[in-house]
């Protein structure tokens, strides 16, 4: 499962380009689950810097499909956690 998170301090938001992409390609607004394939496709297509809003750079974390997860954040920098494990975005 792929999950979109904010990978810088500031907080999750989408750029106008990302909003337009989601509306034009899928006819939806940005209020979708972070694991929604359409949001994931948007970030993969545009890139995290373009898809992220003014104080946001977006990344994709991939976790096993059977994991119950949630997003935690510190000053807007997000990561995905399970009760006893966590995954962080790795810059490539």
Name every feature range the model reports, one short phrase each:
Residues 1-72, 76-92:
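Catalytic phosphate/metal-binding cores of nucleic-acid and nucleotide-processing enzymes, i.e., regions
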């Amino acid at each position: 499962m792929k999950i979109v998170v904010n990978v810088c301090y500031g907080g999750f938001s989408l750029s106008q380009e990302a909003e337009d992409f989601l509306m034009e390609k899928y006819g939806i607004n940005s209020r979708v689950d972070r694991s929604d394939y359409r949001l994931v496709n948007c970030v993969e297509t545009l890139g995290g810097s373009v898809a992220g809003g003014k104080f946001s750079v977006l990344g994709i974390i991939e976790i096993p499909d059977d994991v119950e997860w949630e997003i935690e954040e510190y000053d807007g920098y997000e990561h995905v956690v399970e009760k006893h494990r966590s995954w962080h975005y790795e810059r490539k």
